Amino acid sequence: MTDDKPTLVSQLAGAGLDRREARWLVEEFYDDPVALEAAQKRRLSGEPLQYVLGHWPFRSLDLDLDERVLIPRPESEELVDVALTELAKNDAVTPLLLDVGCGSGAIGLSLLAELGNRGLRASLVALDVSPDALALSRENARKHQLHAVTFVASDWFSELDPSFRGRFDLIVANPPYVSEVAFTELDPVLSYEPRDALVAPDASGVGGFADVQRIIRDAPQWLGPSGVLVLEHGYDQGEAALRACRDAGYRDVRDLEDLAGHPRVLVARP
């Protein structure tokens, strides 16, 4: 840091900001004192740092972020790792990917970028029911010059072109899976994020399970012969997810634990 940046960091820290966060804000808004003051107020009011900065790293990508989309979680980086591992088993040179509920584009765009770095000519279909989320995902695709993307406004699979049936090598999803009851008990900072990206109705006696169940049920008709579904679910939804897979006729199903030891990522092949 140069010039008066250390002084500014100390001032922000003295006002109540975490010193590391103060350093990030100074680096981001150093050339605009008015914006720096506004950012300080936003963060002190409880707004997530990622929204205040307007961008945040996710794997190899620096993603633009704001209140239109959910802030990507570390668990979703694990989801990408699992998806890459499973996709490698298919030996597809030009894999076709579907990101169901793409949000900021974090998962699908990361897959597209990393597969490209491995020399694979992947194509991505990214769908979301939120026009705002799709707009931001498009912005992130342009930012990182990821052009092999088709964006679709759709409530899960409902508006997906029928020509895609039986073609996807990978369907990846991080749907809402928090129940109404659990949402009221979460950190208040989550009130800044789009509620519909977090909360789902109950299903089959399981809180917040409706969207997970629907994706498990409908995904097989869109997967290719060697295709795989990789889906993140709630830590307490593992048994229900496995049961839903059995009901939907999947032949190869695993539920992987996250870093905290909770069942978190479902891997299923029809």
Regions found by a protein language model. Give the residues of each.
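Non-catalytic nucleic-acid substrate-recognition regions in nucleic-acid-modifying enzymes
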Residues: 1-19
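Conserved AdoMet
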Residues: 20-86
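Conserved beta-strand segments of alpha/beta enzyme cores
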Residues: 62, 123, 148-150, 251-254
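Conserved SAM/SAH cofactor-binding pocket of Class I
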Residues: 78-184, 214
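Class I S-adenosylmethionine-dependent transferase superfamily signal
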Residues: 111, 189, 215-219
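Mobile active-site "lid"/loop adjacent to the S-adenosyl-L-methionine
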Residues: 176-211
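C-terminal beta-strand of the catalytic ATP-binding
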Residues: 177, 269-270
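Conserved Class I SAM-dependent methyltransferase catalytic core
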Residues: 206-268
